[in-house]
Amino acid sequence: MDLELTAEQKMIVKAASEVAKDFDPEYWRNKDKNHEFPEDFWKALVDAGFVGIVIPEKYGGGGMGMFEMILAMETLTSESCGLAGEWFLCLTSVFGGLSVLKHGNELQKDNYLPRICKGMEFCLGLTEPDAGSNTLNIQTAAVETGDEYVINGRKTLISGADRAKGMLLVTRTTPLEKAPKRTLGLSLFLVDMPNQAVEVTPIEKHGINYSKTCDVYITDLRVPRENLLGEKDKGWYLVLDTLNPERMSFSAAAAGLGLLAIKKAVEHAKQRKVFGAPIGSYQALQFPLAEAKAKIEAARLLNYKAAWLYDRGLPCGAEANMAKVVAVEAGIQAVYHAMQTFGGYGYAVDYDVERWWREVNLTRLAPVTHQMALSFIGEHVLGLPKSY
């Protein structure tokens, strides 16, 4: 693994930095306050080619890999965009683009990938009220009827479902009690949205208010058989393949948010004087920021390794989960101590740190909880007994 970025990768970083300049913290402050989708930001991501980075050139994409996607996400996030720098790319490019690219047939690729490159928004219909971390407990049922499937069920906490033109929907095609093994019986479908059989209800939430997260109610949704992604009953393995790049994306977001907060805290700590000296000269403020910076850089390297392995088709679950554990804790530490550096201003909306605090804490809960990532490391890296 060469740590020197190629000329092409450096161009990705530069282009992401240029895009971020047009969307400063005030822009995001207003979008979050007014619960407005950032239409012009999404258009900028599409026009710059970031949405199609991982999609082959023959479909209109950049023909690059997850490593380059991570660079774009991290740069957009750390330059000024906060979690939005990763959020929309993960929803569409990872959930939609990578899933279709890796597991779709040629007709599905021809149908969806060019449209994704042009800005077709996607969402992932995975989580259910009784199936969060326990994905195998999914109850949304898809019943085969002739040349189509009829789907009924409920999903929750589905981000982007209100705007998505496509949903990767995780269903159960064989009841759990009838499946030959627990990991069989799930199937994935590509669903065109919006759809009269799919009711979408936004959930009021703590942050990221420029993107809606929704309850989704599915009633007699009819999906053609040709919209089945991969093999029937083997969707669990496709879900697993999506989870690693999802974790890498959120690691990039946590690291990027941490870097953004540290940068702003350092600027303030150099200018703000208390007792006749810049507050940055006091170890109580300086050392926590320095420690967070060191941890973030370590997390970035581990995340790069995970993406490098993924792009070569090598096992990367250990690296992806460890990167998320380290990046999230470092990012939260960085934003927390940035807030302490700003003092009372850190709690004020106009200084943005409180928004980054609301955003970075999501990375500890999603796309997998901190505890589930640690469980993976304990069981699959250390070889300890299953802990749940």
Residue ranges and their predicted role:
Residues M64, N134-L136, G160-K165, P180-L184, ...:
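Short glycine/proline-enriched turns and hinge-like loops at secondary-structure junctions
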